[in-house]
């Protein structure tokens, strides 16, 4: 199935992998609004499901989505940026976006450090 939007919630970094296992409510809320308005979307939650970036390939749709949104928190920002780079390579025609606390506070720094 081809999705309009693919949401990815990467695994937390290092020893924070078991810290407070909660789904990203932000992604769930955005998904609900998209569903109500007729957009197809899929959530790949590596954090809740316990998958790392090496296992991500098996969970992703084959066809490129139009938009990929990656959730980036203070606990997973390193993995989120690596995931964003990987997904930009896998889906070169998709618009890649990162949302969350870290990118809100230091967007210029992240854009300079990770220009993918």
At which residue positions do the language-model features occur?
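Glycine-rich beta-alpha loop elements in corrinoid/cobalamin-binding modules
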Residues: 20, 26, 33-116
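N-lobe entry segment of adenylate-forming
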Residues: 1, 21-22
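Nucleotide-activated donor-dependent transferases that construct or modify glycoconjugates
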Residues: 3-16
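Short N-terminal or domain-adjacent regulatory/targeting segments
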Residues: 1-5, 50-52
